């Protein structure tokens, strides 16, 4: 508590003269007193060790100047693991091999280093691969990330035509009935009511069955007749001559054309024949001339 007035007194004696006329202290004694006051003030302040400030300039410079500290700590941890003889395989937490209830401690940084991997047994480095059950990470097994299994598309069901509920089942005709119906149709395609009743009773059929059979047989005969007429039309239809396309060749094809050109150039075949001027076939330009005359008129 006496340092403050002492400091004031020192300041007055150091930088100025005292107010009174008494003799002041000497400069050497004033400097010593100021140094003692500064030391007391520094001792009163709380001192912070550099270790408590990891981001201070001193701590950063110390880490930068000593790069071998981490390597020495890693080597020490590796040697401790080798001495203990408890090399843990990859992917196994440290507490799983020991007591199951013990809390798992964080892995050292040198656990996956080159030296640690070389010291591990081969069984720990090589995983057993089974084609039946491939290993998957937990995030791949979750349905959120793994794609859904492919669904097998069943073939579409064949939709059949639905018949009427009151439809009567089809009655098959016997061979004798079919022969009699066909013979009667060749004789007469249209039957009267009396003829149909008599004919149906002789075949043990109803009049409706005979009537429907004759209708279907007439439709079939009509289709066959139209097909025959179409064939006859195609057979009787003449092929378009080459003159329709602007070209006309004599009968015999290209071979006859070549022979005619050779005969017109060298005359008739035989010895001692003079060469004659080539004469074009008569019908070669007939179509072109007619086409031009038609447009000129």
From Swiss-Prot:
Subunit structure: Interacts with CREBBP/CBP, TBP and SP1; interaction with these transcription activators may inhibit autoinactivation. Interacts (via C-terminus) with PIAS1 (via N-terminus); the interaction is required for the localization of both proteins to the nuclear periphery and specific binding of MSX1 to the core enhancer region in target gene promoters. Interacts with H1-5.
UniProt KW Repressor keyword: yes
Feature: compositional bias, Basic and acidic residues: 127-136
GO cellular component terms attached to this protein's record: nuclear periphery
PTM comment text: Sumoylated by PIAS1, desumoylated by SENP1. Sumoylation of Lys-9 and Lys-127 not required for interaction with H1-5, transcriptional repression, inhibition of myoblast differentiation, or binding to gene promoters.
Protein name: Homeobox protein MSX-1
Compositionally skewed regions (Low complexity) per UniProt: 25-38, 71-95
Gene3D superfamilies assigned to the protein according to its UniProt record, in alphabetical order: Homeodomain-like
Signal peptide: none
Region (Disordered): 1-51, 63-111, 127-157
